[in-house]
Amino acid sequence: MPVNHRFTFSYRLLFLIFLLSFETAQRLVTGDPNDEACLTNLRQSLEDPANNLRNWTKSFFINPCSGFSSYLHGVICNNGRIYKLSLTNLSLRGSISPFLSNCTNLQSLDLSSNQISGEIPPQLQFFVNLAVLNLSSNRLSGQISPQIALCAYLNVIDLHDNQLSGQIPFQFGLLARLTAFDVSNNKLSGQIPSNLAMRNGNLPRFNASSFIGNKKLFGYPLEEMKNKGLSIMAIVGIGLGSGIASLVISFTGVCIWLKITEKKMEEEEGKISHSMPVY
């Protein structure tokens, strides 16, 4: 019996389309397991006294995304995957779970203006697509992991107003796309990496405001700001010194004038007494 090759090809094509459709439908129902693990672990590591994450439940973690939207507060999706987490100013406490890195498609992470403590997990290095990292205004401590610089697409690193210590990793200066950098008001020490402070013409790559508030941090552009401060103090000192010197000279002049005047008056009195007739 002759085989109808056209029929066989059509059958195989339909079967392939069915499999792809079934797989897509299954993903839409269950979501991505990496995103589910990411959200589950992050929720377990955070405390939510204001109950802002009340809909962060397991039933939603199974399928957090519906195309480009999500029912979860602070979660933004793109093509069925989480690509942005924005949980800013929600009074959150706790720590950042290292398993947050399971959100492998994440491009923006903003946990700013909370009360999150602990260290910044080095596992954030696995966010290969991450462009924005904002963990500012929290209570994060410990050293900044240089491994975060493995996120080659980073263009924003904002860690200001925390309790971070140690040195600024020089690897951050190797991030070619980095356009915004702020580690001010921490407990950082050591010299500012030259590749973060290098000049672009007459301007530094990042100015002093990116580094201020770290008492043991030094180097350009902080040194220039300190020198300007010293110059102002010197000017004030010179002004005060000049004023005091002028007062001393004036006072001395008055004293000398009074002394001379007193002596002249005594001489005049003597002359008058000699010229008066004796009766």
UniProtKB/Swiss-Prot annotation:
Domain of life, source organism: Eukaryota
Bilayer disposition of the protein: Single-pass type I membrane protein
Keywords tagged on the record: Cell membrane, Glycoprotein, Leucine-rich repeat, Membrane, Receptor, Repeat, Signal, Transmembrane, Transmembrane helix
Per-repeat ranges for LRR: 103-129, 131-151, 152-174, 175-200
One Pfam family from the record: LRR_4
Glycosylation sites: N55, N89, N102, N134, N207
Cytoplasmic side: 250-279
Transmembrane segments: 229-249
Family: Belongs to the RLP family.
Protein name: Receptor-like protein 57
Organism of origin: Arabidopsis thaliana (Mouse-ear cress)
Source species taxonomy: Eukaryota, Viridiplantae, Streptophyta, Embryophyta, Tracheophyta
